Amino acid sequence: MSDNMQPTDEVLDDEVLDEAEGADSFDEVEEFDPFEDMSDEELDALCDEDENLAGFGDVEPGFRSGFVALVGRPNAGKSTLLNACYGKKVAITSPVAQTTRRRMRAVVNRPGYQLVFVDTPGIHKPKDGLGSELNKSALFELNDVDVVAFLIDATKPIGRGDAWVAEHVKNARSKKVLVLTKADEADPAQVMEQLKAAHELMEYDDEIVTSSVKNFNVDAFIETVAHFLPEGPRWFPEDMGTDASDETLVAEFVREKVLRRTRDEIPHSVGVICDALEQTKKVLRVHATIYVEREGQKGIIIGKGGEMIKHIGIDARRDLERIFGTQVFLELDVKVKAGWRDDEAQIRRFGYNAED
């Protein structure tokens, strides 16, 4: 190793093991106390800092907090339920399957508890590298949360897709809550049939029937999952709504407008990156690039005389002005990146990869 190179963690681990193996016993390895030279005052300050890092603000005894993953097939209503729980739109929605590509966290505060809802991509049989990453992202959350809310559409017969999701959900260590969504679109007999079929897939710790668009049982759903949260600190500040960056919100809301305007023509080939975001005194200046895989798709998004891209920009700007609370100047470009959905580097560039 040259003098200018820093040793990696693996090299350091190997060196520590080599020293230990060279000694007659581990007793001969010199003990190291990182706090040995610290005064009592410095130790107290370190402890105070550690307590501040563990949570935000004082909480009363019995305060509950934790993470709730919303999982299910594509178009099961996960993002719509997340928005309903939060009270306003933070996750994009569209009739197109696999609209959600990024894990989105939304913080919901209530007296006595804090819930962090995690919206996940729909779990499905992947057809490309992007689909595989979306599945990994969703499945990663199952054992990393306190509660898994398994969403099943009340209007669609339960099939192999739901069964495949259930196989993963039932093996999770988390509590499981069955959530039957879109109840406003189903008759009572259909709801009862869906509940029966859902219980043939697996066992649940609780269940609830909801309609996010009608705000039916949304608060009851929040209370249901909060019951399973452990006692703990407030993980996020009370004034924090989502962990998504401004750049992520820009990219997602632009992509949503593309999906809604183009529908079935090019949905899965679209990726968006926010290239620049600058806040001036009176306006937020934003530049984003829409990527597709073929020249023909680029033409569809631009539209005749630029009409389609104009409407996409107007729609996105309205949402961004609502989110950021300021006037937005939005500039959009459209570029072709052939085969990006099977390119791991490009998937990471768009931010659609599962966490390492």
What are these regions (language model features)?
Residues 83, 102, 106, 136-143, ...:
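Solvent-exposed alpha-helical segments within well-ordered globular domains of core cellular machineries
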Residues 108-114, 133-207, 261, 278-283:
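Conserved C-terminal guanine-recognition region of P-loop GTPase G domains, centered on the G4
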Residues 77, 217, 308:
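Conserved glycine(s) of the Walker
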Residues 2-5, 9-14, 18-19, 24-147, ...:
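Conserved G1/Walker A P-loop phosphate-binding module
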Residues 100, 123-125, 157-158, 186-187, ...:
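Catalytic P-loop NTPase motifs of RecA-like helicase/translocase cores
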Residues 88, 107-111, 141-148, 201-204, ...:
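Conserved, well-folded catalytic cores of nucleic-acid-processing
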Residues 248-356:
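P-loop NTP-binding site
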Residues 175, 184-246:
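Canonical P-loop GTPase G-domain recognition
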